[in-house]
C-alpha cells in the first residue's frame, strides 16, 4: 500500500484525515483524499486570498463555486464562461494535454445547460530557438486545433507569448463561453434524497489516474514517467456528449449535472453531494469499464475523458437512457443520493470506502504561506537606436508582437456561423442567434509586467482586457481568471501570488467587473526555471446592439486618427526587452480612474456611431498599434507624433490607458465634447491615406514604408521563428 507521502499528502494532512474519519484510512480512501486535497482541487494555498475578489454584481447569476460563472445579459439570456489550465499535462504530452484541456472546459459549460459557442486559448512557451519548445508549441497548437475543430466549437481568440522562463513549463489556459436561457440553467447540487446517480458518456479506463496530484507538483526529470497521468481525449465522443446532455438537461427530472474532470468520480460525486448538503452512495461494479481487472482504486480515481454525472429522479431514468442510447453513448445508474452526508463507495455491494463528503471538499487544512518581497532593480539606462525604422521592423517581427495568423488559421473560427469579428483584432465578437445583441471575448496578461511588479501587472491585465472589449463596442460584464505561478512554498512566489490577486481585485472592483469563475495553477517550475507570475484574465463583454460592433481595421481614406489618452512614458516594455535585452525596470503606471474614463470616451463614441475603427495600445506601443490597424485595413496612414520625451519611447513606449480611433473630420467636435465631458485629453495624430506607412516624431520623418512591406513582416515572422 502506498503511503500518504507517496501520494503527496503531508504528515499534518494525514493526521487531519485520521481525525476526520476517527480511524486510519484504507488505500482507496487515502487515494481519494490525495486527489481532493491536492492543490489542483482544493486551492489550499489560495482559498483565503481568493475571498477578496469581487464576485457579485447586478448581472451575476452564479459566481465561483459551480462548474462555471453565469452572467445575465437580458432578454432571458445568460453568458456561461470559465477558464482553466492544463499546464502540467501539456508539458509532458502536449497534444493530448492541450486537447483534453479543451474537452474539460467545454464540459464545464454544457454541464450548466449552456451551448458552447466559443473557445479561447492563452498560451506561453519558451524560446523558439529550442527544439523542445518547438515540439511543445507544435503539439499544443495541434491538440487545440484537433479537439476544437472536431467538436464544432470555434476557437475565436487568445494570445501567445514566448519567454525563456516558460521553456520547461508551458502555460496552456483554455476558456469556453456558452449561451443559455436564464430559466434553463442547471447547477451541480444534489438536493433530492433518493435520486438516482447516473454516469453517462464514455467508458472508464486507467488513463489520468492521479492527474490532479500530478498537476500539483513541480516538474522534474521524472515527470516523463507520469505520462499515464495525462488523459486521452476523443473529440467525436465529446460532440455526441454535448448534444445528448443538452437534450437530457431539458428533462424536468434531471436535477443536477457535473463534469468528470480532475479526480474523476471522486471529485464529481463528492462535490455534487457536498454542494447539496447530501450524501452519495455508488457501486463501482456498475461503472462501464473499457479495461479488464480494474480495481476500486483505479475506477474511483480514473480521469477518463468525456464522462458526466447526472442526478435524476428515478422515474425519469429510462427517458434519460433512451436519449444517450440514441446518441450511442453509455448511461448507467451507479448509485443514489442519500441523507447521511457520507460518500460511500461499494464494489459488488461491499463497502470499499466511506468518507464524509465535506471532509473531501471543505476540510483540507489551509496552508499558511510566508511572504518575501522581490527587490526590483529599478529602471535601466536604455541606449537610443540610430535607425528607428529598422528598430520598428525588428520589433514588429519579434515573437511576442508579430501576427499569430499562422496559428489561428489552423483553428476553425467560423464554425457555428456566429463569429463577426475574427481573430487578429482586439477581441472576437460573436452574434447571438435570434437576438440583436452580441458578445465580445478576450484573454490578456503580460507576465513580464507581473514579474516586475505583480500588483501593477495584474491591474494592467484587467484594464487591458477591458480596453480590448471596449474597442469592439462592448461593455465588460464579467471576468474569469487563471492564476499561473511557480511554487508557493517559495516566499517570493507567494508574495507575487498575493500581490497579483490584490491587483486583480482592485482593478476589477474599480472598473465594476465581477470575477465569476477561475482556476489556480501552481508549481509551474523546474529545477532550472520558475515561470513569470502569469494571472491570465478572460473577459466577456456585452454589445447591446449589433450595429455598435467595431474593429481595429482602418477603413476610410481621409479619416482622422485620434489618440485617446495622450500620455507617454519611458518604462520597461517589449521594446526595451527585445531590442536591448533589458529584462528589468519599472512597469508602465496605470491610473484606474483615467483608465475608466478613457474606456467611457471610446465606448460612448462608438455608440454615437462616429468611430470607424478602434484599437487598444499595448505591446509595441503606438507604432505597432498603428501598423496593426493599417495591415488589417490594407490602407496606409500618415502620422506626426508630438511629445517631450525620447523618440523611441514615443513610438514604442507602453504607457497604459490609451486607444486610437479613426473618425471622419466632421465628427471631431462631437468626439472632443465626449472627451471633455470625461476630462480626458485627445489628440489628432494623423490621417488614413494611400498605401504608405509614415510616422514622424516632432515633425521629423522616422518611418516610411509601404503597407506591403510591414504586412509581410507582420504575417510571416512567427512561421519563420518556428521553422528556422
From Swiss-Prot:
Classification from the root reads: Bacteria, Thermotogati, Thermotogota, Thermotogae, Thermotogales
User: What is this protein's record name?
Assistant: Phosphoribosylformylglycinamidine synthase subunit PurL
Question: Which function does this protein serve?
Answer: Part of the phosphoribosylformylglycinamidine synthase complex involved in the purines biosynthetic pathway. Catalyzes the ATP-dependent conversion of formylglycinamide ribonucleotide (FGAR) and glutamine to yield formylglycinamidine ribonucleotide (FGAM) and glutamate. The FGAM synthase complex is composed of three subunits. PurQ produces an ammonia molecule by converting glutamine to glutamate. PurL transfers the ammonia molecule to FGAR to form FGAM in an ATP-dependent manner.
Supply one GO CC term from the record: cytoplasm
Q: Where does Mg(2+) 1 bind?
A: 84, 519
MF GO annotations: ATP binding; magnesium ion binding; phosphoribosylformylglycinamidine synthase activity
Record-level GO BP terms? 'de novo' IMP biosynthetic process
Q: Which residues bind Mg(2+) 2?
A: 108, 259
A Pfam family it matches: FGAR-AT_linker
Tell me which EC number(s) this protein carries: 6.3.5.3
Query: Which residues catalyse the reaction?
Result: 40, 86
Q: Which reaction does it catalyse?
A: N(2)-formyl-N(1)-(5-phospho-beta-D-ribosyl)glycinamide + L-glutamine + ATP + H2O = 2-formamido-N(1)-(5-O-phospho-beta-D-ribosyl)acetamidine + L-glutamate + ADP + phosphate + H(+)
List UniProt keywords, sorted A-Z: ATP-binding, Cytoplasm, Ligase, Magnesium, Metal-binding, Nucleotide-binding, Purine biosynthesis
Quaternary assembly: Monomer. Part of the FGAM synthase complex composed of 1 PurL, 1 PurQ and 2 PurS subunits.
User: Where does the protein end up?
Assistant: Cytoplasm
Binding annotation for ATP: 43, 82, 481, 518
Q: In which pathway does it act?
A: Purine metabolism; IMP biosynthesis via de novo pathway; 5-amino-1-(5-phospho-D-ribosyl)imidazole from N(2)-formyl-N(1)-(5-phospho-D-ribosyl)glycinamide: step 1/2
Q: Where does substrate bind?
A: 85-88, 107, 231, 303-305, 521
Q: Which CDD domains match?
A: PurL_repeat1, PurL_repeat2
Q: Record's family?
A: Belongs to the FGAMS family.
Q: What is its main location?
A: cytoplasm
